């Protein structure tokens, strides 16, 4: 299937917040309770429809460990959107958001759309970060905000699609020069396969088990 535009995304945040599970839920509509820890960068894709146009989302799922931050930083360049994820049950993942955001804004294009995601909202009995705190952080830093659950699929579609809608609006408003692919946007005619795929050799093949919601 052909597409009008291709948008490149990057998913960032601490390890274990559910980045890979969000991607899997969005591309395959399934939840994997125990997910291998991402080493390096992995890849997924899916077609969506915005304003009657087919949009292909090409999504890079990054490792959250500090030792892989240099690899992650190289993927900020050429991304139109970023999903910045924390775990509502682990306060430290929220506390680290400022560092992730600083990285994103230092290495990405200044018009990149950033969606802040408080994941694992199904675990309300273990909540350590309030919804209001997430909303306030997003407001202070000019981000879009949603709470999601990769387990139940709550707001997962909305997180990816609302980010795409914001990017599409910026195209309509002339914010992006779509002929410049360094903005993470490509005007396209053909289409590729949707669904999680392996990253480049050596980037996603070494893994460890980790719980994921």
UniProtKB/Swiss-Prot annotation:
GO terms for biological process: protein transport. It is found in: Cell membrane. Its main location: membrane. One of its GO terms (cellular component) is plasma membrane. A lipid is attached at residues 212-213 (S-geranylgeranyl cysteine). A motif (Effector region) lies at residues 35-43. Keywords: Cell membrane, GTP-binding, Lipoprotein, Membrane, Nucleotide-binding, Prenylation, Protein transport, Transport. Pfam families: Ras. One of its GO terms (molecular function) is GTPase activity. Gene3D superfamilies: P-loop containing nucleotide triphosphate hydrolases. Residues 202-213 have a biased composition (Basic and acidic residues). InterPro entries: P-loop_NTPase (IPR027417), Rab_GTPases_membrane_traffic (IPR050209), Small_GTP-bd (IPR005225), Small_GTPase (IPR001806). It is a lipid-anchor. GTP binds at residues 13-21, 61-65, 119-122, 149-151. Residues 194-213 are annotated as: Disordered. SUPFAM superfamilies: P-loop containing nucleoside triphosphate hydrolases (SSF52540). The keyword Nucleotide-binding applies. PANTHER family: DRAB11-RELATED. Belongs to the small GTPase superfamily. Rab family. Protein transport. Probably involved in vesicular traffic. This is GTP-binding protein yptV4. It comes from Volvox carteri.
């Amino acid at each position: 299937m052909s597409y009008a535009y291709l948008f490149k995304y990057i998913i960032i945040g601490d390890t274990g917040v559910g980045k890979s599970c969000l991607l899997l839920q969005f591309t395959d509509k399934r939840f994997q309770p125990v997910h291998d820890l991402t080493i390096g960068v992995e890849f997924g894709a899916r077609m969506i429809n915005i304003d009657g146009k087919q949009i292909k989302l090409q999504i890079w799922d990054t490792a959250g460990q500090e030792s892989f931050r240099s690899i992650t930083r190289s993927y900020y360049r050429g991304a139109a959107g970023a999903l910045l994820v924390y775990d509502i049950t682990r306060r430290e993942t929220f506390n680290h958001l400022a560092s992730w955001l600083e990285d994103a804004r230092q290495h990405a294009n200044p018009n990149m759309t950033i969606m802040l995601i408080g994941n694992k909202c199904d675990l309300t009995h273990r909540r350590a970060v309030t919804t209001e705190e997430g909303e306030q952080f997003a407001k202070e830093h000019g981000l879009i905000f949603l709470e999601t659950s990769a387990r139940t699929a709550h707001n997962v579609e909305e997180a990816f699609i609302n980010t795409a809608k914001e990017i599409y609006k910026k195209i309509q408003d002339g914010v992006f020069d779509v002929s410049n692919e360094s903005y993470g946007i490509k005007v396209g005619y053909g289409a590729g396969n949707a669904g999680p795929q392996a990253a480049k050799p050596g980037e996603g093949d070494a893994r460890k088990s980790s719980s994921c919601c």
